[in-house]
Design a protein with these regions (language model features):
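Contiguous, well-folded functional domains in the mature portion of proteins
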Residues: 1-178, 182-184, 190, 194-204
């Protein structure tokens, strides 16, 4: 976490991949570009090493190993969806390095993707990084440009600044960010693929 010059607390979401961060609106899938699941950013990866963007618990892993849901102690829920329509690969090209329930540190390896094999299959490897919950009462900034996995922030979630700027108020805001957990993060990865399929069918029809 970083403290901004105006006294607000910023929760830094690091890039899970080395590459280039681009606006979510540029992702050629309406489920992501229209922010149906959540807001965030997308990464054009240079390699397939997928790391955790935040200290968190692994709350969901897609059966096909292409998507990961995480929840931080502060209630921030993050979903990483490696590539588009990668659910159709049924786990091919992906190697999972964690299991549900694991506690991971920012920068810790979650999975490995065979980027060359994905490109040979003509899979679009653009990877949405979404904030799916825990942002109630908070604002969010996304950043674009070259990024290094586990080092450069791509999203900052800001708590509302305490009126008197006191450290006590800041601490209270962090310890009780929402009062209650957001949507069930354990279903995040499945929800993303169901909504993608539903949207795709509606576009066809």
């Amino acid at each position: 976490m970083n403290k901004n010059t105006d006294g607000c607390i910023g929760i830094r979401i690091l890039s899970p991949l080395t590459g280039t961060a681009v606006p979510l609106e540029e992702v050629p899938d309406p489920v992501f570009s229209q922010k149906i699941i959540g807001d965030g950013v997308a990464i054009l990866p240079q390699d397939g090493n997928l790391v955790s963007p935040i200290d968190a618990e692994v709350v969901s892993i897609a059966e096909t190993l292409h998507a990961y849901g995480l929840r931080s102690e502060n209630g921030i829920e993050v979903m990483i969806h490696f590539g588009l329509e990668t659910v159709a690969l049924k786990g091919e090209c992906f190697q999972c390095c964690v299991k549900v329930g694991d506690k991971v540190k920012a920068g810790e390896l979650l999975a490995k993707a065979d980027l060359k094999a994905l490109e040979e299959k003509q899979v679009n490897t653009v990877t949405p990084v979404l904030i799916c919950g825990g942002t109630e009462g908070r604002s969010m900034n996304a950043f674009t440009g070259p990024v290094k996995a586990g080092t450069d922030a791509v999203i900052t979630v800001l708590d509302h600044c305490p009126p008197d700027g006191t450290a006590e108020a800041e601490t209270a805001a962090l310890q009780n960010p929402d009062g209650a957990p957001a949507a069930n993060a354990s279903s995040l990865t499945d929800t993303a693929d169901r909504k993608t399929e539903k949207t795709r069918k509606s576009l066809i029809n």
